[in-house]
């Protein structure tokens, strides 16, 4: 091979390597508040160890629907079972998503409680895995984007 051909092969190899590194970096840092838009159905369960909720300490489970605005705001409805006591509530709150698709959110329920979560978004932004990050809970769960949501079809 001539020097010119070797140089071209080396330049092409370097170019391919750099473009694949850039693609990998952008894939790792692809999330922001705008990544969460639309409605998600969620479920969480675990234990209320010492949080001040009706029913007191004991098993804890909840299901609901959360709607994100893509700008750091959210609202939703939730049905909670706290040690067998059923609580129907609505909430509003805020969230923040980091570039690595991890985040935090805080929901203030109309029954006087505020619950904080840490989460990660996966499955091409369609699924969320979360834990309650407040003391007094050992609760985890997941949320799935609703395909019937008009915004999810855009």
Ranges and model annotations:
Residues 2-12:
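Bacterial N-terminal signal peptides that target proteins for export
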Residues 24-154:
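Mature soluble binding/inhibitory domains
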Residues 11-20:
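Bacterial N-terminal signal peptides
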